A protein has these predicted regions:
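Hydrophobic h-region of N-terminal signal peptides that target proteins for export
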Residues: 9-18
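Positively charged n-region of N-terminal signal peptides that target proteins for export
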Residues: 1-4
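N-terminal catalytic scaffold of extracellular/periplasmic and nuclease hydrolases
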Residues: 19-182
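Short helix-onset patch at the extreme N-terminus, typifying the N->h transition
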Residues: 6-8, 59
Length: 182
């Protein structure tokens, strides 16, 4: 009986692992690197709050996000590198250096039938979250980025901050239909 139970549990576990993870979360500390994490952790320990929870996560990674046209990488190029695996120019979001659209890991997850959500503490049209759904040569094209958001087919978007499109949206048909929701 014990052997049969063990075999059944092993089969269920193998089945669960064969399907892949149920959820995948990608946390991006925009502009944050190892020295910032070390400093914050040391501060937290000395303050008496213990180590940072993010340092206890089972899996962590760092990535090198080099811009294709500058020694200093901006958020748009960095987000594109993380999301799409391709180096691009500063200010470009979700496109390669020639302006050709790239597709992010989030698009491939959606195509594979997964639910996809983008959540950010900054506006949802900011370069970092936009790197996962937008295709623009100018990170400042927040109206175009918001159109890409609507076309993405993703399941959830949530962002913070004041809507940077407010002044451009007034007079647009969708603004008249929705009105001020804030």
């Amino acid at each position: 009986m014990k052997k049969a139970l063990l075999v059944a549990l092993a089969a269920m576990a193998a089945s669960a692992f064969a399907e892949g993870p149920k959820y995948v979360f990608l946390f991006i500390g925009d502009g944050m690197s190892v020295p910032q994490r070390m400093t914050a952790d040391e501060f937290s320990v000395k303050k008496g709050d213990g180590h940072l929870a993010m340092n206890a996560m089972p899996f962590t990674a760092t990535t090198r996000t080099c811009s294709a046209d500058s020694l200093v990488t901006d958020s748009a190029a960095a987000a594109t590198a993380i999301a799409c695996g391709t180096k691009t120019k500063n200010h470009y979001v979700g496109v390669d250096s020639g302006g050709t659209p790239l597709y992010s890991s989030a698009f491939f997850a959606k195509k594979a039938g997964r639910k996809v959500g983008i959540i950010s503490t900054v506006t949802i049209t900011h370069a970092t979250p936009a790197g996962f759904y937008a295709h623009r040569i100018n990170r400042g094209d927040t109206y175009g980025i918001s159109l890409d958001l609507a076309d993405s087919g993703f399941d959830l978007f949530a962002g913070g901050g004041l809507d940077v499109n407010e002044k451009n949206a007034k007079g647009h048909k969708s603004y008249a239909e929705c009105g001020d929701i804030c």
